């Protein structure tokens, strides 16, 4: 079944102002895709963090481009794309750089308007030089991605059962050792 989403507007909607977001979105059909926050850093990096893995550019524009590329890749891995975004929370370390982010955001979304919330934070957990993090929700067709996208059970660390289609790569070895 195809997804069904509708933008919600107030009865007193003003059409004489530019709105870079939708006031609300109703999802009546489709599969929800929840994305962890992405930054300009590589999605897959060591935990605890290692400084040498974070070669971050200095400007908001450059970091926003890298964050949007990471967002796009994660959406594609889930079987959808940027036009499927319905909500995003954007965390910035300096809200004065929001216009730089908005320009990159508009270039990538090409007129698509998910709901957005922008929050200024003192620091992001990924790295001290990180300027932006985007957390998002998308909706895609119920069957988009095929049976390999079916819900799986996960353990408390977020790993799918070994050998299941949701398990990416070889099973992880426990750091705890034998029990």
Describe each region flagged by the PLM.
Residues 1-69, 73-87, 92-179:
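N-terminal presequence-like segments and the immediate start of the first folded domain
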């Amino acid at each position: 079944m195809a997804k069904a989403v509708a933008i919600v507007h107030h009865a007193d909607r003003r059409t004489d102002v530019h709105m870079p977001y939708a006031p609300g979105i109703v999802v009546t059909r489709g599969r929800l895709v929840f994305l962890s926050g992405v930054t300009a850093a590589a999605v897959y990096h060591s935990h605890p963090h290692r400084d040498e893995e974070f070669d971050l550019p200095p400007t908001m524009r450059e970091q926003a481009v890298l964050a949007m590329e990471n967002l796009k890749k994660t959406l594609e891995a889930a079987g959808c794309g940027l036009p499927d975004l319905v909500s995003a929370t954007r965390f910035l370390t300096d809200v004065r750089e929001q216009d730089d982010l908005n320009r990159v955001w508009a270039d990538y979304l090409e007129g698509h308007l998910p709901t957005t919330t922008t929050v200024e934070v003192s620091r992001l957990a990924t790295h001290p030089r990180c300027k932006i993090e985007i957390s998002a929700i998308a909706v895609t067709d119920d069957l988009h991605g095929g049976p390999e996208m079916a819900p799986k059970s996960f353990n408390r660390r977020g790993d799918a059962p070994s050998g299941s289609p949701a398990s990416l790569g070889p099973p992880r070895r426990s750091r705890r050792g034998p029990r």
